[in-house]
Amino acid sequence: MDMEKTFNLTRRDDGIAILTMDVPGETMNTLRSEFGPEISDVLAEIKADTSIKGLVLVSGKKDSFVAGADISMLDACETATDAKQLSQQGHVVFNELESLPIPVVAAINGACLGGGLELALACHKRVCSLNPKTMMGVPEVQLGLLPGGGGTQRLPRLVGVTTALDMMLTGKQLRPKQALKMGLVDDAVPESILLRTAVEMALAGKRPAKKKHQSFFNKVLEGTSAGRNIIFDQAGKQVAKKTQGNYPAPAKIIDCVRQGMTKGMAKGLEVEASHFADLVMSKESGAMRSVFFATTEMKKETGAGDVEPQKVNKVMVLGGGLMGGGIASVTTTKAKIPARVKDISETGLSNALAYAYKLLDKGVKRRHMTPAVRDNLMALMTTTTEYKGIKDADIVVEAVFEDLALKHQMVKDVERECGEHTIFASNTSSLPIGQIAEAASRPENVIGLHYFSPVEKMPLVEVIAHEKTSAETIATTVAFAKKQGKTPIVVQDGAGFYVNRILALYMNEAAQLLLEGQSVEHLDKALIKFGFPVGPMTLLDEVGIDVGAKISPILEKELGERFKAPTAFDKLLADDRKGRKNGKGFYLYGGKKKAKEVDQTVYSVLGLKPGVDTEATEVAQRCVVQMLNEAVRCLEESIIACPRDGDIGAIFGIGFPPFLGGPFHYIDTLGAANLVKILENYQSRYGSRFEPAAKLKQMAEEGTRFFS
């Protein structure tokens, strides 16, 4: 019996053939190496049939053209030669498609990403639908890779070097009208007439491509080799600054484009295949692909086994501050669920509404939505100063001050005013959920739902189950968080949960280094060089020095002496330094200069004279090993279920460098024995806070790893 085909050819009476890609048994199309012979046979058949006057390439999937190459085939590559052959195989097929003597048109509806866009680029014309799900881009850089199917060569020739580099170096995805404006597609039409438009294009023949939309300045730059060299040099400098040398893919992308534009497409494709192979085998891409697979896996999980989540039709948010406003905003705009915000003051409610409106209005200004859509989404958010209109709330998210008595009162109020099924989800950042649930008559409905600030940008939420939380409550809360566009990790109850617990020791160590004479700039630069998006002092300013001061005593009380924050930091609070929020912290705020400057008076407040500035790798290592050690303790204590969750929590919650794969992947890279040695060295110099976790010592003795 014949296997089901992926590529099916149908001939129309007008001489146009339709080639439909439909991977059997999958919801989305992805490109796989085994498709090579099949598509080559189809192309040979088309070439041999003189009755075919034009070809239109379409997808058989709803709302998806081609989502990219199947990433799992990269893990099957044992050598760089294997990876290079994958790229070269793609080149052969796409070159065959491009060299067909008849017009070839890609009719794009839905996601057209990575290898999918490279397939479309090999066609002579492209038309896309105006479907909101139609997005185009080359996001390979986000996996530590580069477009390996000719994308580094065809994209700059179509849209210009500057635009192509921007797309490839950021991995950004374009909406239909953006793609049309830059010349990536030749037309963007309603989905209902997409096929008809593509057929008409094919019948019209190979007309010269529309001139790409470029500024006069870019035309001058890109029109000469000297101008292009300026573009490449500038891109190289920006990449070096942004990546700190930690990510090899961006520099290789620039080199592919440079070589292709200088020495011709054949040379460019050769360089592309070679660089692609090197990146596939690199530890950085391996780590970033592990993050991709982990998040893909987690999307399928309920957090509570086979238990089905309950439907959430209405949400209430207690507190209209930054967190409350952000939570209500993602509930209405992302999850499209009505949210009612309660605050004791009208000011708080106004702030929550203004917060949501500002975010939606950005979408209008960027033409991502119409004013009518914005207003309809705003209508989903209502406000109250009393417990009115909330009887039917399915989830109540509490986002009030870190005060246990206040949270107890909230629990009692909600149980009195809402239904028996209502879930009480606390956004506490440090208080154990079990302690909050002590005030509940229905503790099985109480759960932690810890968001990170700013809520609309940070992808992670911690779903915290205490010992009496029901499986249904967990499953419903996880499903709700996913609807908000979040990546949830289920963690067990305990002070600081997972993310804030590992972050606290990292921050405390940075504070110790500051008190030893390291400068604020040096500390921040050392950790940025290591791979964090911001340094610890900047982070403390952003989070709030006062917030850190409130959390530390809770962690110290519950978890022990190693969480004790340096007492010298009390002097910062006495000087009314809260960070960015009151314009007074480690850095100066409110000035006209773009670059941040350290507030030099912070040293005198702390009674310090900076000037030690130890070697940057040593500074970073001292902070990072504290985080790694505590992550292992969290696994030991079953705060996190598995190393995978610990990696995702650290990357998405605090910006742990993705190219290292997360704390547990990084420990595997370092080796447990090596990490124990580093910790014991610090323990002998700085004390018991560096004592290695028992599990780490055991792994060092046995020579085991977290991942196979």
Curated annotation (Swiss-Prot):
The record marks 118, 140 as: Important for catalytic activity. GO terms for cellular component: cytoplasm. The keyword Oxidoreductase applies. Residues 310-708 are annotated as: 3-hydroxyacyl-CoA dehydrogenase. Its main location: cytoplasm. InterPro entries: 3-OHacyl-CoA_DH_NAD-bd, 3HC_DH_C, 6-PGluconate_DH-like_C_sf, ClpP/crotonase-like_dom_sf, Enoyl-CoA_hydra/iso, FA_oxidation_alpha_subunit, FadJ, NAD(P)-bd_dom_sf. Its EC number is 4.2.1.17, 5.1.2.3, 1.1.1.35. It is found in: Cytoplasm. It catalyses: a (3S)-3-hydroxyacyl-CoA = a (2E)-enoyl-CoA + H2O; a 4-saturated-(3S)-3-hydroxyacyl-CoA = a (3E)-enoyl-CoA + H2O; a (3S)-3-hydroxyacyl-CoA + NAD(+) = a 3-oxoacyl-CoA + NADH + H(+); (3S)-3-hydroxybutanoyl-CoA = (3R)-3-hydroxybutanoyl-CoA. One of its GO terms (biological process) is fatty acid beta-oxidation. One of its GO terms (molecular function) is NAD+ binding. Pathway: Lipid metabolism; fatty acid beta-oxidation. Keywords: Cytoplasm, Fatty acid metabolism, Isomerase, Lipid degradation, Lipid metabolism, Lyase, Multifunctional enzyme, NAD, Oxidoreductase. It holds the Pfam family ECH_1. It comes from the Bacteria. The keyword Isomerase applies. Residues 1-190 are annotated as: Enoyl-CoA hydratase. Catalyzes the formation of a hydroxyacyl-CoA by addition of water on enoyl-CoA. Also exhibits 3-hydroxyacyl-CoA epimerase and 3-hydroxyacyl-CoA dehydrogenase activities. Heterotetramer of two alpha chains (FadJ) and two beta chains (FadI). In the N-terminal section; belongs to the enoyl-CoA hydratase/isomerase family. PANTHER family: TRIFUNCTIONAL ENZYME SUBUNIT ALPHA, TRIFUNCTIONAL ENZYME SUBUNIT ALPHA, MITOCHONDRIAL. This is Fatty acid oxidation complex subunit alpha. It comes from Shewanella halifaxensis (strain HAW-EB4).
